[in-house]
Amino acid sequence: MKSKIVVDSSSNVYELPDVGFACVPLKILADEQEYVDTAEVDAPALAEKMRTYKGRTSTSCPNISDWMAAYEGADEVYVVTITGTLSGAYNAALLAGEEYEQSHEGARVFVLDSLSTGAESRLLVERLAALIKAGKPFDTVCEEIRAYHEHTHLLFALESLANLARNGRVKPAVAAVARMLGIRVIGQASDAGDLEVICKTRGEHGALERMVLEMKAHGLTNGRVHIDHCCNAAAAERLKHMVHAVFPEAKVEVGTCGALCSYYAEYGGLMVGYEDNEAPTV
């Protein structure tokens, strides 16, 4: 039986060694130009453009055919999508899974709504890979990734809310006030998959301190932490050191946002996925 992990590009995972893998890109539209979120797109250049761009922008998710093509060649497919509250990717992946099972005798497709995006999705993808490499059967993998998902979390710190406002995720007035006052917004992915604001801070140091406090409050001890940044490597490294100062056994990695996450996190933004202390092991 051939296994395959399939994700959309909001996970910032474009390749995964030693397992069957496919990444299905989301797209960003700006200034009549389409940016396909692959490893080749210049995400920092896109983020720089969005800093001054005043026109209309939008995003689009993979369709059923895109997902079907990604599933091809596998008998057991494990899918992780961006939260269904932000995108239709989850529903499209589900429908594609039903069609794939009908047209491929014996095939099985499991679709997990991450209820999140970015760095938390990457934790889920990496755990799926570990479960597959451990040789666990399909139903066990599905059961264990659901259990693991109960103990992963997403935090974000944003310097700008412009693109979230353009797409109806926050009120334009809130975005304007945040920009004028130099406020950084700290938020999280809720249990329902909504991106919700926790607090607002002034200055980068205060934002990073609050993120560490939130991780502590949600049970981080010696677990894994992924920090993805949009054109803000210095802040990401600083946060890594701050996390290690409080949680010296935590396994912290720093990465970069792809195009879709750069679009929403915007220039200077940070996205942090982490495990709490009750996360099960493989």
Where are these regions (language model features)?
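Mixed-charge interfacial surface used for oligomerization/domain docking
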Residues: 3-4, 10-22, 26-27, 32-33, ...
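Structured loop/turn residues at beta-strand edges in well-structured enzyme cores
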Residues: 1, 19, 72-75
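Class I S-adenosyl-L-methionine
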Residues: 33-102
